[in-house]
Amino acid sequence: MLHRIPAFIRPRPFSGLPLSCGNREVSVAASVLPAAGSGAVRTENTIQRHFCTSRSICSKKDDQSVPANETSQKAAESQGEGKETLKKNLLDVIKDMKVQLNTANVKTTKPRGRQPPAHLETAVGRLQKALGEPPRKRNEFLSPELVAAASAVADSLPFDKQTTKSELLKQLQQHEEESRAQTDRQKRRVSFTQIISNMKIAKSPSMRVSSRPQHQIQFDEEVDSSLSQEKPADFRRRKCLFKGKRLSIFDVKAFDDEAPEPEAAPSLWEIEFAKQLATVSEQPFGNGFEEMIQWTKEGKLWEFPVNNEAGLDDDGSEFHEHIFLEKHLEDFPKQGPIRLFMELVTCGLSKNPYLSVRQKVEHIEWFRNYFNEKRDILKENNIHLTS
């Protein structure tokens, strides 16, 4: 039910704030804002009625209104007190916390994008490999029988056993390293990658027909005919240097008596110049046979008929000279540890295809000279090399 407002009562201006039914603070704020705008303070008891959605009427008796400046100051003070209380609560919580130190290993996380440089990785890998692998022994490539025979020879001799054993094993190790180096060189020589890299793609020459205009051919023919007509007949005759009278400037008998000088072998520079000249004047292959001939010269194909010993620089030595080396052991004793040691040495040399006969004989000669130097000491201990 709505009450009528008499006409003599002056209506109050609408504050523009949303009002809710039964809210005391809103009604007070509605009454304070117009007064704050004008700067006056109302002290009379007034009854404020507002419309609401419900049937009840909101009313408030204001005994005394408060200025707007005081309300804003109170609100700011209340906010400041709230912040201070929050800070105090946080400080209390932090004080109550206990810090526990952990002695576990700290793992530093590396950024995902960054990677160590390549040279650092290779250096670290080599260091780890060097630390992980045990050091190589000098006699790791030698057979245990050969090492045992060398130690037996050293035990049988009267002088320092360790020095004698080390000298013998050192010579054997040197021989083994030479043979291994030659095997690596041989493998490197027959590598498939080297064959492919040296191969050249042969292109068939394109048949080009030189077409000249007709007037140019006629012009050339005319020029040739005019020159041939002008040349005399004597000029066109062929002259031979070995016909006619001799001038007798040189003595023919002196040159005949001189023996022909032996032809010297071409030097390295001449051979290299001939190779360069051949490559410059080289023409594409006409067929497959020419290509196979060239590959045979370069060592990419076997010679035909097939020769298994092709490319071996062995000074023409026979096969049996590589295998049967017992004839070089005549100066050594017939029995005993020295004989056993030398038999093992010759057995290893006969199975080595990478050493020439001269190198094998030199290897045996080294041991002969070594024992001959110790001949006086061996005689004192009743050990004879030729027994």
Curated annotation (Swiss-Prot):
<keyword id="KW-0809">Transit peptide</keyword>
<protein>
    <recommendedName>
        <fullName>Small ribosomal subunit protein mS31</fullName>
    </recommendedName>
</protein>
<comment type="similarity">
    <text>Belongs to the mitochondrion-specific ribosomal protein mS31 family.</text>
</comment>
<feature type="compositionally biased region" description="Polar residues">
    <location>
        <begin position="66"/>
        <end position="76"/>
    </location>
</feature>
<comment type="subunit">
    <text>Component of the mitochondrial ribosome small subunit (28S) which comprises a 12S rRNA and about 30 distinct proteins.</text>
</comment>
<feature type="region of interest" description="Disordered">
    <location>
        <begin position="59"/>
        <end position="83"/>
    </location>
</feature>
<dbReference type="GO" id="GO:0003735">
    <property type="term" value="F:structural constituent of ribosome"/>
</dbReference>
<dbReference type="GO" id="GO:0005739">
    <property type="term" value="C:mitochondrion"/>
</dbReference>
<dbReference type="InterPro" id="IPR026299">
    <property type="entry name" value="MRP-S31"/>
</dbReference>
<keyword id="KW-0687">Ribonucleoprotein</keyword>
<keyword id="KW-0496">Mitochondrion</keyword>
<dbReference type="GO" id="GO:0019904">
    <property type="term" value="F:protein domain specific binding"/>
</dbReference>
<dbReference type="GO" id="GO:0005763">
    <property type="term" value="C:mitochondrial small ribosomal subunit"/>
</dbReference>
<feature type="compositionally biased region" description="Polar residues">
    <location>
        <begin position="207"/>
        <end position="217"/>
    </location>
</feature>
<keyword id="KW-0689">Ribosomal protein</keyword>
<feature type="transit peptide" description="Mitochondrion">
    <location>
        <begin position="1"/>
        <end position="56"/>
    </location>
</feature>
<feature type="region of interest" description="Disordered">
    <location>
        <begin position="203"/>
        <end position="228"/>
    </location>
</feature>
<dbReference type="Pfam" id="PF15433">
    <property type="entry name" value="MRP-S31"/>
</dbReference>
